[in-house]
Swiss-Prot record:
Reactions mediated catalytically: Cu(+)(out) = Cu(+)(in); Ag(+)(out) = Ag(+)(in)
GO biological-process terms attached to the record: angiogenesis; cellular response to cisplatin; copper ion import; copper ion import across plasma membrane; copper ion transport; establishment of localization in cell; intracellular copper ion homeostasis; plasma membrane copper ion transport
Regulation: Copper uptake is inhibited by cold temperature, silver and zinc ions. Platinum-containing chemotherapeutic agents uptake is inhibited by cold temperature and copper.
InterPro entries in the cross-refs: Cop_transporter (IPR007274)
Protein name: High affinity copper uptake protein 1
Tagged with keyword Zinc-finger: no
Cellular compartments annotated: Cell membrane; Early endosome membrane; Recycling endosome membrane; Apical cell membrane
Membrane-topology annotation of the record: Multi-pass membrane protein
Site (Cleavage): 39-40
Annotated gene: Slc31a1
Natural source organism: Rattus norvegicus
Main location: membrane
Free-text domain note: The C-terminal domain mediates copper(1+) binding and is involved in the copper(1+)-dependent-ATOX1 interaction. The C-terminal domain appears to act to limit transport through the pore by regulating the rate of exit of copper ions at the intracellular side. The N-terminal domain can collect copper(2+) from copper(2+) carriers in blood. The N-terminal domain, in the trimeric arrangement, tunes its reactivity with copper, promoting copper(2+) reduction and copper(1+) stabilization. The bis-His motif directly coordinate to copper(2+).
Alphabetically ordered keywords of this record: Cell membrane, Copper, Copper transport, Disulfide bond, Endosome, Glycoprotein, Ion transport, Membrane, Oxidation, Phosphoprotein, Transmembrane, Transmembrane helix, Transport
Amino acid sequence: MRMNHMEMHHMGMNHTDDNITMPPHQHPTTSASHSHEMMMPMTFYFGFKNVDLLFSSLVINTPGEMAGAFVAVFLLAMFYEGLKIAREGLLRKSQVSIRYNSMPVPGPNGTILMETHKTVGQQMLSFPHLLQTVLHIIQVVISYFLMLIFMTYNGYLCIAVAAGAGTGYFLFSWKKAVVVDITEHCH
């Protein structure tokens, strides 16, 4: 069946090059002065008026609100770093159950040697794995929140993310165990 493209009228779509302006972004408040354009800043700025923080209902308008947001974001970034280290520790603890399996292998001159294999096992439906899964979901959500906060390009909030992550790393990662396998050829 052959279709005539001109008869389809582009399925009723308007394909003109009209200049469309977006309506102002309104937040659900009683104040008429609480509106701003939907355009996001594409450069870093230091301000505290009409700063959206993750949700349209979380708008920063005063220096006090910015200070509170700074502290909250700082603590969230610290918590994120602590969560990463805690997950590593839980993973190490859950993999302590090591089994050794031995099997006989022929040796020189007809002797029999025992070869030992180490097996570290964890079941998919075990409590440690389910806990790691839940903590991973929380970690992913927090990481995206921190990314979106940084993408506001508000200098104060960006500093809060970076300083909180740095402080969290400083506080939680200093006792991070570095395990080096001596049989590994590339260190």
